[in-house]
From Swiss-Prot:
The keyword Hydrolase does not apply. Coiled coil: none annotated. Its main location: cytoplasm. UreD, UreF and UreG form a complex that acts as a GTP-hydrolysis-dependent molecular chaperone, activating the urease apoprotein by helping to assemble the nickel containing metallocenter of UreC. The UreE protein probably delivers the nickel. It is found in: Cytoplasm. InterPro entries: UreD. GO terms for cellular component: cytoplasm. It comes from the Bacteria. Required for maturation of urease via the functional incorporation of the urease nickel metallocenter. Disulfide bonds: none annotated. The gene is ureD2. This is Urease accessory protein UreD 2.
Length: 286
């Protein structure tokens, strides 16, 4: 099977809105994935479900083929992270680990998908595809990051990283395909930086994306030792962000800055909607 063709998901989760909360209505997982309890912990967003994805192996190995699928049905709100940074170990010559992440966000849903970075060990080889399908009136923040580590301190690097991000509106052709392919990279290529990341922010058309991009740029400027750039995506569909840093902690600060801006926008929009909802509510009989 081609590396670009996803296998049957070994993690398959579906989320629905029931009353004032989001719940899981499909929970299927197999080794190495583990899913324990999920939580409603955000007092400002009581509808939002927090999920921590775990792996029994704690790492990605040379010939792993892993597919995840997350489906958010109409009105669901989900925040997803992982148990910690995931190591990607050495692959035999001619082999590479393959991972697909399929994210489907339906009308009115909200997804915050921020897994911890991958740690690429010497001679690691990873092909990953992240496919985001997002309805026009849904919101999604999706991040991806990697760093490099040689436990022997000799400066050895990974063998290959083939990463593709696909973004599409619901049921339509891709409006963004972003690919990075590094094979046997030289140390000089990274210019002293060892941690790299990207983020895609999709918002409903009611938001001023150009103004949001400027807010992000201002937030990034306040983070030391972080190289960051934010750009508008094609057709004004969203915002794309790139990060380069010397350490992972600076990447995390950048991602936190994006999430903080998104949260402020979201809570502001909800506060503005509350008076209108109250004004149009029908009186009920005592």
């Amino acid at each position: 099977m081609s590396d670009l063709s996803p296998d049957k998901p070994r993690l398959d989760l579906s989320f629905v809105r029931r009353g004032s909360r989001t719940v899981i209505d499909r929970r299927l997982f197999a080794w190495p994935f583990v899913l324990t309890r999920s939580f409603h912990t955000d007092a400002a967003r009581p509808d939002c479900l927090s999920v921590i994805l775990q792996t029994g192996s704690g790492a990605v190995h040379g010939e792993d083929r892993l597919t995840q699928r997350l489906t958010l049905h109409a009105g669901a709100a989900v925040c997803v992270t992982t148990q910690g940074a995931t190591s990607v170990h050495r692959a035999e010559p001619g082999a590479r680990a393959v991972e697909h992440v399929l994210l489907h966000v339906e009308a009115g849903a909200s997804l915050d998908y921020r897994p911890e970075p991958r740690i690429l060990f010497p001679d690691a080889a990873l092909c990953q595809v992240l496919d985001l399908e997002c309805a026009a009136d849904a919101a999604a923040l999706v991040t991806d990051a990697f760093t490099m580590h040689d436990p022997d301190g000799q400066g050895r690097l990974f063998r290959e990283l083939d990463s593709k991000l696909i973004v599409r509106r619901q049921g339509k052709e891709p409006l963004l395909i972003d690919r990075m392919h590094l094979r046997d990279p030289a140390t000089a290529l990274f210019n002293g930086r060892r941690a790299f990341g990207s983020a895609v922010l999709m918002l409903p058309p009611t938001h001023d994306r150009a103004a949001i991009r400027l807010r992000l740029a201002d937030a990034f400027a306040r983070i030391d030792d972080l190289y960051a750039a934010a750009s508008l995506l094609q057709d004004g569909a969203g915002i794309g962000v790139r990060f380069a840093a010397r350490e992972v902690r600076q990447l995390r600060a950048g991602f936190d800055a994006v999430a903080a801006v998104v949260r402020e926008i979201d809570l502001g929009a909800r506060a503005a909607q509350a008076p209108r909802a109250a004004a149009t509510a029908r009186p009920t009989a005592a």
